[in-house]
């Protein structure tokens, strides 16, 4: 898994370096002078001639059209994947530092087994992007009000989901005033509203422009690499959580996969990874 993360990071920073230095054009010029480049051009020309015979109206996209149709234009799946990844990473870092300053000790705030990614922050950014995009040009008060209710509802539903599916609770605000079932409270709803204004007015527009500068092919490859890694990471995390909760009533594994989970992600590992997690099923 860490090898995949390293490869993904290498490609990501390679894309950024290319954007800053114009390396694509330099690479193409070098390829054009090489024998491999000449062979590639001949193959490309042959394929292109066959395409033109099969589809007479087909033509190459001009540079002007490439500017009009950049990678991940508008609110689309490709862009939302990068919004999720970036927000999950930054959210985990911010929350880790915040909890370290408030509690006086560091703890993991990640939602998954591997990597510093908070799915709550990542999915929250996606939810705010999709639901509030239509209010981007409205007054900040409307954005704040929408973020207040949408963010509070989202946080509440996340708490309900994890308790129903995994039998775990990751936060409990019962000790705070104006809380709603201990799952959210008015103070954090207020923070959601403020965050919505900054997100939809400042942060997302800047992030959107940056994402659209990715080269189309590299962007597509990286997007699907991110999806594959995060899906595998998430599924493995779900399996480890479910096994953690069933281990108290069924310590002996039923199959080789459960043996793997017990060996790699035992109770000590899970408790270190998510120190604030409360297993409601274990306490019953």
Predicted feature descriptions by range:
Residues 1-284:
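Aromatic-rich, lipid-facing transmembrane alpha helices and their immediate juxtamembrane interface loops
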